[in-house]
Amino acid sequence: MNTVFNFSSGPAKLPIEVLQQAQQELCNWHGLGTSIMEISHRSDEFRQVAYESEQDLRSLLNIPDNYQVLFCHGGARAQFAAVPMNLLGKSKIADYIHGGYWSYSAAKEAHKYCQPRMIEVMTYINGWRGIKPMVEWVLSPDNVAYVHYCPNETIDGLTIDELPDFGNKIVVADFSSAILARPIDVSKYGVIYASAQKNIGPAGLAIVIIRDDLLINRASTKLPSILNYQLLANNKSMFNTPPTFAWYVSGLVFKWLKVQGGLVEIEKNNRAKAILLYNTIDNSEFYYNNILPVNRSYMNVPFYLANSALDDLFIIEARNAGLYALKGHRVAGGMRAALYNAMPLEGVKTLVQFMHNFACRYG
């Protein structure tokens, strides 16, 4: 089989070692004669999977003891609703930092449950797009329920690497496309949530990391049980049947990350991949990227051809060369390469060589 490199932004590439282990165990998991997909989530065997998954994630992210880890249904879009429904309390106002498509989408969903105050932080300087430094963000007074932002915008290719320092405000972050890509200080956040299908595992699962004090006396009485953080925490994420296969594969990914050397090594690899691709774009007149270097995402690299009439041909020839899912999002156009943890440096080198060859032939 020819080597294929999948640059999809999600569902995204999984580590080949994880896929091979899941394949090997699929029909006879741990000698039980049955699949992991068929055993009860309340069995001792699956409870061990759940326990190890949580402990490995805690180890990777250095999650403090006063935080709960929830394995939830529904991906990040479900959390767009769950966050305000769980956290509003007496205040019906929340600050939403508008740094791109997904932060705007979160605010739009939250509007059904609260009054989101949109804080514009995007900047445009001589055709370059970027994000204002946090010190320039004009937040609401202290009576807001929380401050929500998205550290990495997959469609826009924008990242916010600064750690939030907003005093006593509760900070909520959508880390869907940045979780496990580098070390983070979890204690700076009240809630971190992330859909699985980018850097964690298969689609259908979301992980929520929430500080203990935010589980008490905040949730709306009309909150659906499946979205109730306190109820999920009290039942160890098993109030109802969880997405067990996605949970299991995510656990394998956590173990794979530890074998790679943890998040310090993962960050080095991710930066090396992104720098190689950005340098190729910047040193070419055939391709361009309009994001300020300080705000360029290391996970999602959008780029454009100077001659957009060649876009479709680029996609076709790239796929023929084993480079999949490079077409940009429908709202942004152009190209986009997702460089999540499972993408090897070899994949980016292959993409860069293809880009050189394509530019030589059509430039």
Curated annotation (Swiss-Prot):
<feature type="binding site">
    <location>
        <position position="197"/>
    </location>
    <ligand>
        <name>pyridoxal 5'-phosphate</name>
    </ligand>
</feature>
<keyword id="KW-0664">Pyridoxine biosynthesis</keyword>
<feature type="binding site">
    <location>
        <position position="102"/>
    </location>
    <ligand>
        <name>pyridoxal 5'-phosphate</name>
    </ligand>
</feature>
<feature type="binding site">
    <location>
        <begin position="240"/>
        <end position="241"/>
    </location>
    <ligand>
        <name>pyridoxal 5'-phosphate</name>
    </ligand>
</feature>
<protein>
    <recommendedName>
        <fullName>Phosphoserine aminotransferase</fullName>
        <ecNumber>2.6.1.52</ecNumber>
    </recommendedName>
</protein>
<keyword id="KW-0963">Cytoplasm</keyword>
<comment type="function">
    <text>Catalyzes the reversible conversion of 3-phosphohydroxypyruvate to phosphoserine and of 3-hydroxy-2-oxo-4-phosphonooxybutanoate to phosphohydroxythreonine.</text>
</comment>
<dbReference type="InterPro" id="IPR015424">
    <property type="entry name" value="PyrdxlP-dep_Trfase"/>
</dbReference>
<dbReference type="GO" id="GO:0030170">
    <property type="term" value="F:pyridoxal phosphate binding"/>
</dbReference>
<feature type="binding site">
    <location>
        <position position="9"/>
    </location>
    <ligand>
        <name>L-glutamate</name>
    </ligand>
</feature>
<comment type="similarity">
    <text>Belongs to the class-V pyridoxal-phosphate-dependent aminotransferase family. SerC subfamily.</text>
</comment>
<dbReference type="GO" id="GO:0004648">
    <property type="term" value="F:O-phospho-L-serine:2-oxoglutarate aminotransferase activity"/>
</dbReference>
<comment type="pathway">
    <text>Amino-acid biosynthesis; L-serine biosynthesis; L-serine from 3-phospho-D-glycerate: step 2/3.</text>
</comment>
<keyword id="KW-0663">Pyridoxal phosphate</keyword>
<dbReference type="InterPro" id="IPR000192">
    <property type="entry name" value="Aminotrans_V_dom"/>
</dbReference>
<dbReference type="GO" id="GO:0006564">
    <property type="term" value="P:L-serine biosynthetic process"/>
</dbReference>
<comment type="pathway">
    <text>Cofactor biosynthesis; pyridoxine 5'-phosphate biosynthesis; pyridoxine 5'-phosphate from D-erythrose 4-phosphate: step 3/5.</text>
</comment>
<dbReference type="InterPro" id="IPR015421">
    <property type="entry name" value="PyrdxlP-dep_Trfase_major"/>
</dbReference>
<feature type="binding site">
    <location>
        <position position="42"/>
    </location>
    <ligand>
        <name>L-glutamate</name>
    </ligand>
</feature>
<keyword id="KW-0028">Amino-acid biosynthesis</keyword>
<dbReference type="GO" id="GO:0005737">
    <property type="term" value="C:cytoplasm"/>
</dbReference>
<keyword id="KW-0718">Serine biosynthesis</keyword>
<feature type="binding site">
    <location>
        <position position="174"/>
    </location>
    <ligand>
        <name>pyridoxal 5'-phosphate</name>
    </ligand>
</feature>
<dbReference type="GO" id="GO:0008615">
    <property type="term" value="P:pyridoxine biosynthetic process"/>
</dbReference>
<dbReference type="InterPro" id="IPR020578">
    <property type="entry name" value="Aminotrans_V_PyrdxlP_BS"/>
</dbReference>
<keyword id="KW-0032">Aminotransferase</keyword>
<feature type="binding site">
    <location>
        <position position="154"/>
    </location>
    <ligand>
        <name>pyridoxal 5'-phosphate</name>
    </ligand>
</feature>
<dbReference type="Pfam" id="PF00266">
    <property type="entry name" value="Aminotran_5"/>
</dbReference>
<feature type="binding site">
    <location>
        <begin position="76"/>
        <end position="77"/>
    </location>
    <ligand>
        <name>pyridoxal 5'-phosphate</name>
    </ligand>
</feature>
<dbReference type="InterPro" id="IPR015422">
    <property type="entry name" value="PyrdxlP-dep_Trfase_small"/>
</dbReference>
<comment type="subunit">
    <text>Homodimer.</text>
</comment>
<feature type="modified residue" description="N6-(pyridoxal phosphate)lysine">
    <location>
        <position position="198"/>
    </location>
</feature>
<dbReference type="InterPro" id="IPR022278">
    <property type="entry name" value="Pser_aminoTfrase"/>
</dbReference>
<keyword id="KW-0808">Transferase</keyword>
